Amino acid sequence: TIDDGFSSFYENAWPILKKNKIPFILFVNTREVGTFNYMNWQQIIELHKEDFVEIGNHSHSHEYLVDETSNVIKDDIVKSIEIFKNKLGYNSKFFSYPFGEYSLEFKKIIKELGFKYAFGQHSGVIDETKDYFEIPRFPINEKYGDLKRFQTLIKTLPLKYISILPKEKYLSLTNNPPIVKVKFFKDVKNINQINCYSNEGNVWRKSKINFINELNIQIILEEKFISERGRINCSIRVNGGFWRWLGIQFVIAEK
């Protein structure tokens, strides 16, 4: 997946992806299309004609919508849907949350507007048990895009879970830090070997884990999340140098 639709993607990555017919989703925020450093609609339509390319919706404004009211969120997304229909003749079934930030209310709006899948920016691997409106992705960019990291990421496997609490990933001042609990499926092996790290207190550190039973853990956060996004990454090493990986992202309310 590629977010934003920058012209640098069209100039550098598109020729390689096209030559090798590598399938991908390009998420575009409709307000920026055709402006400086962004692809135009002619280029987007060129990609859309290929059967291995999907064009996804990335909102209209790409603002911090999760902090806005329901009406503001809905108006922004509806505007992008109208532009999609005008330019491409349809609205995409794929959505990418701006900055990977979402709340239960944001998810509800996306479902009501007819989307089938929504992507965040919390790290992890897709599998059939995931919530289709909280699909994980590993960021690959100029800051997190070196080859060594990429080689690690392509050796990750899903860490399957039944549930993560709290369901609400949008934190207020009163529930930060959150009480984080994960319930795994019975076929997940070596839960006792799991390691989790978080950026609580704005410093990445290893988190303490309370093993409630063989399927349930509590990730203990001793300090509040300070940065705008609170992150937890958990992994279990498996044979062959692979890792089972689970990422959780929280959004910290401005007020």
Regions found by a protein language model. Name each.
Residues 115-124:
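Acidic, His- and aromatic-enriched active-site or binding-groove loops in soluble protein domains
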Residues 1, 5:
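Substrate-binding cleft of extracellular glycoside hydrolase catalytic domains
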Residues 6-106, 116, 129-139:
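Metal-dependent polysaccharide deacetylase catalytic core of the NodB/CE4 family, i.e.
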